[in-house]
Amino acid sequence: MEEFQVYLELDRXRQHDFLYPLIFREYIYALAYDHGLNSSILVQNXGYDNKSSLLIVKRLITRMYQQNHLIISANNSNKNPFWGYNKNLYSQIMSEGLAVSVEIPFSLQLISSLEKAEIIKSYNLRSIHSIFPFFEEKFPYLNYVSDVQIPYPIHLEILIQTLRYWVKDASSFHLLRLFLYEYCNWNSLITPKKRISTFSNSKSNPXFFSKSNPXFFLFLYNFXVCEYXSIFLFLRTKSSYLXLXSFGVLFERIYFYAKIKHFVKVFDKDFPSTLWFFKDPFIHYVXYQGKSILASXNTPFLMKKWKYFLIHLWQXXXXXXXXXXXXXXXXXXXXXXXFLGYFSNVQXNPSVVRSQMLEKSFIMENLMKKLDTIIPIIPLXRSLAKAKXCNVLGHPISKPVWADSSDFDIIDRFLQICRDLSXYYNGSSKKKSLYRIKYILRLSCIKTLARKHKSTVRFFLKRLGSELLEEFFTEEEDLFSLIFSRASSTLQKLDRGRIWYLDIFYFHQ
């Protein structure tokens, strides 16, 4: 990155339309393809080495300099001479270049904000570790939780208009709009088969992206979520807790921060609705992937108001059609909230904590809520069935995709899945469901080996013996755990206790 810093500083000197020249710079595509222009898509095209890849980029830049080739006919865009026979390759290269150039102002803004706040740069900002202290410390004291599915905008034009409020570069966004329309005509980026989140199993998210160009569209999607979250948090902090104060939602982003300084009742012309809700100092907001969690200690009446407020905010500000089922409010003690990509559920159960002030005094029992991790067998089995490790009924089957690998690699891949599950669900008190999943993986591994060697499952069971069985069901005892030791004989039964999420801290380091 240091070798390109000089070029970036020169291009940043033009504050007006400073992004547009970056699209014609070779080093932008070098940054996109890991400094070598030989990764991602270019690797899949046989016969292209580093030099020829650089020639492809130069040829693409030369075509972009010829402005007449960038004009697309409104009647028939398929005859556009700009792309030629290599339209898929050129479009993929250009999408990576656009992704890098658009991300530059936001990355520079993040670095400057970290420097002003004297915060050390962290590469683990998207870590899941911050979720677990939230559930451990805050979640048991809340009454209601709302599991929210963040909808996706109806059209990509909405994302471009949102970006224009942050970056004043008309030329770049005209080219970006032209590029997206060309992509939509080919149907090569947006396909009805791949979702934006591979872990999401909700059918309410209409956003689908192809595997070949995820970086650019994931940036647009994450920016839309960030924009929605910023408006939501701003309205939450500025709402009134006294009486039923009403105000208009600041849907448009033009002069948004000027309106923050002089906060008054502002009504949008297209959406003159008035929202009524309270400022809740006890509400907690956690966003992960395409979903978010709203947890509060308020009454169900206020939670319903927040629910309809979110739906109205999506429909008016983000121009997304969100159904009422997208935000479901439930009592935290009665229902579990599924979160993250590991299909983990948590439930708040009552627990008795015994305490003793003096050695021979009475033992006091305090009732408090504790968090139990549940291993959901049905979602995990569905995930394994999607990965072709078992059928829909949970019966193990062979995985033919891995049959071409060596025996060591096949066994190691299945064992790695078991280690991941053990590390994640190690704190669960009931591990019967985990053992069932491991049993499915073990038989799937053996059937894959038998398929590779054209033999029977019984033969491989005799050949491998009990060693493979022990490896699949061995607990990860070497993982770090926090143990509380007490010398008092009265509390002998409470000597050991595991804080389960610390195991994941160690596993992901």
From Swiss-Prot:
Q: Which GO terms describe its biological process?
A: mRNA processing; RNA splicing; tRNA processing
Q: Where in the cell is it found?
A: Plastid, Chloroplast
Principal place of residence: plastid
Which domain of life does the protein's organism represent? Eukaryota
The record's GO CC annotations read: chloroplast
User: Which InterPro entries does the entry link to?
Assistant: Domain_X (IPR024937), Maturase_MatK (IPR002866), Maturase_MatK_N (IPR024942)
- Spell out the molecular function terms from Gene Ontology: RNA binding
The alphabetized UniProt keywords are:
Chloroplast, mRNA processing, Plastid, RNA-binding, tRNA processing
UniProt lists the family membership as follows: Belongs to the intron maturase 2 family. MatK subfamily.
Reported function:
Usually encoded in the trnK tRNA gene intron. Probably assists in splicing its own and other chloroplast group II introns.
Report the protein name in the record.
Maturase K
Tell me which species this is from.
Vachellia farnesiana (Sweet acacia)
Upper classification of the source organism reads:
Eukaryota, Viridiplantae, Streptophyta, Embryophyta, Tracheophyta
The gene behind this protein is matK
